[in-house]
Amino acid sequence: MPGSIIAAYFFTAGTFAFYATAAAINFAVSFVVTRVFGSKPPNSQDTGARQQVPPANNNSIPVVYGDAWLGGVFVDAVLSIDQKTMYYVLAISSISTDASASFSFDRQKFYYGDRLITFDTTDLTKVVSLTDGASPPNVDDKISGKLYISLYTSTNAGVITAVNGTAPHVFMGGADIAAALRWPSSGRQMNGLAFAIVKLVYNADAGTTGLQPITFYCKHYPKGGTVAKPGDVWYDYMTDARYGAGMTGLVDSTSATALNTYSDQTITYTPAGGGSATQARYRINGVVDTGKPVLDNVEKMLECCDSWMAYNAASGLWSIVINKAETSSFSFNDTNLIGEIRVSAIDINQQINQIQIEFPSKLNRDQPDLVYMETPAGLLYPNEPANRQTTTLEFTNDSVQAQYLGNRRLEQAREDLIVTITSTYPGIQVDAGDVVDITNADYGWTNKLFRVMKVSEATVDDGNLGATLELSEYNAVVYDDATITAFTAAP
């Protein structure tokens, strides 16, 4: 098994398709579905979860987890009586119903078009200037008094909190709007949403003849605190009935806690300026496109923390299997193995040795960046062709975490044995995702480790029940901490 794969390069790029099935299903007669990597054509409408979406009757409202930039979804618009002012209502994100959840806006990181917004210090809804990214920056104050952004959050019960201004029925309920179009004082509560009301005053000189895209910077932590931990995000999404799976009572919270604990462990990396630093192994930062199937979104979340999802029919619970270093939970040898041991290897033409990972970079308003990694030439098999995998980590906004996950993927690809065994019936107690060991003199194996990928009940030659297991080669070195250097975007 090789050491860490450390060659990494960064690019700016467009979108690459990614598919990863990260589920394991474990019944009394046990089945497991493993990850399958490769291109997957979209099977649902791309509703543009991070974009400012035009009005449509099939728009879905996204969910922010962690820290993210995104646009809003138009849900209402009103023209003033004098036809000089437009009011727009944008739904930005759903909010967790968990009592400890927190949602906030960082108004110092809002953008109008591609320019940074500065708000007035007295009227907190009033935009007083726009600043571009030039050096030195250009500040445009013509916008002052022409653009207002009022922010709100609403609980699941419909209790609205004004973040930086007046209540909606005050901000969008003045005499300049026809009475029938004003925001009512009750009955329009935007339950469970973060939303904004934008007031735009027409002025050709200020460039406010039409609304440009607004990019909001939001923070949503389903269990409170200052970060979104993977176990908390998974549990929230699996149990929420509005935007998630709605499976309250059917998920294993213990496995979510275990994932949080593993994710909180620190890894060491080299900052862009040199030296040494540490950060938590895994965090979730991204936007859920609720127009896509729930399982697709769960897979994308778990891909960013190198885990699987499992179902156990005996307990009736969905749980998380963490892909990490484990000790053997069951031993197979001549005393409990029945019949042949079937061994195969992954086709050399399908074994990845290059990986290109796209992720939304927190250094550039979540615009896509790439990290590219290769298996060192000395670790390739003779005549092994270049085989690149392209993948997207939608809930990773950090180059260090992206490299860490990419290194694991390349190292895991070096472990290419696939083994099928039949055992006596006690082997049925092995669960999907467990690590087991095999001792067999013919193959020269002494306590050789494998990860269990499928378990099924089988009838053996003597008519008794046994267990058939499909295994993949396991090596704990896959889970070492690679040498990683943080990426800094070019100025």
Report residues per predicted region.
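Polar, S/T/G-rich
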Residues: 2-10, 18-300, 394-400
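Short, glycine/acidic-rich hinge or "gate" loops at secondary-structure transitions
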Residues: 41-45, 248-253, 310-324, 428-430, ...
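A generic structural motif
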Residues: 128, 135, 147-148, 318-319, ...
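Mobile, glycine-rich extracellular loop/lid and propeptide segments
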Residues: 280-285, 289-326, 434
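Acidic, low-complexity/disordered segments
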Residues: 338, 432-491
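Long hydrophobic segments that form regular secondary structure
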Residues: 366-458
